[in-house]
Amino acid sequence: MKIHLIRHAHAGSRSAWDKADHKRPLSPRGEGQAKAVAAALADAGIDELWSSPSLRCRQTLVPLAEATGLEVQVVDVLDEGNDGPPALDALLAAAAEGRVVAACSHGDVIPAVVATATRRGAELEGPRAISKAGRYVCTVADGQITHILAVPPPDGDT
């Protein structure tokens, strides 16, 4: 069983955005990254697409939703500022029901999920934090993540 954790694609400068941050959209670069992520995961057997409520996260999953015919579900536990254990537990509950989830979240939540999983015994292959549009492929066995593989962003940004 797999869980795919995706950091949202490039959304431009937070400081240059003068509206509510959760409404900040993807940049043209981010749109390209989102398409590349979708191409990489289109045949990964994903059953559900989970997103933070933030627009940039939802937009990151739109090309994957189009490729798979799935709807993007907003999951509050993935919102920026949330903690790792509740997000990880929600993802593991879905995996326990046999669902493969691709979840898009933020640069604080994703590393917190990874840190929680490694504290619980998962082996991490790659960095603890990834750049925008980077992702982790998590292997689940016996109700826990056992292995986490970091996949760099599709445009090679580090």
Task: Please give the residue ranges for each predicted region.
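Domain-level recognition of soluble alpha/beta enzyme cores
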Residues: 118-149, 153
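Glycine-rich phosphate-binding loop signature in dinucleotide/nucleotide-binding domains
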Residues: 43-45, 94-99
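Extended, charge-rich low-complexity interaction segments
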Residues: 108-115, 158
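Structural motif
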Residues: 81-89
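Short hydrophobic/charged patches on amphipathic alpha-helices used for structural packing
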Residues: 38, 89-92
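Short, solvent-exposed coil/turn elements at secondary-structure transition points
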Residues: 9, 78-80, 141, 151-154
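Active-site-proximal alpha-helix that buttresses catalytic centers in soluble enzyme cores
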Residues: 2-82, 122-123, 130-133
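Generic beta-sheet signal
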Residues: 3, 97-108
